[in-house]
């Protein structure tokens, strides 16, 4: 299984809202992203759905600036739908 296929599988979450946001980023931005942003995305994919959802809603702020920056990017993509 290629890395992109594996990531696409991991984008399938328990919540439809998360499926959409994570898959949209993977399709639109992942391949052109920096290595640091790719690592941040993989970190987010390893998070539990409620924690990730809280970040995307702005209910929580992640203490790592690189990951928080990606969360803001994900929110921006979500709002463009």
Predicted feature locations:
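Positively charged, polar, low-complexity stretches
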Residues: 2-81
């Amino acid at each position: 299984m290629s890395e992109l296929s594996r990531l696409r599988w991991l984008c399938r979450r328990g919540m439809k809202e998360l499926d959409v946001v994570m898959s949209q980023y993977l399709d639109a931005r992942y391949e052109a992203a920096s290595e640091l942003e790719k690592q941040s995305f993989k970190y987010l994919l390893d998070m539990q759905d409620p924690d990730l959802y809280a970040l995307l809603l702005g209910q929580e702020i992640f203490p790592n600036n690189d990951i928080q920056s990606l969360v803001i990017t994900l929110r921006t993509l979500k709002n463009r739908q």
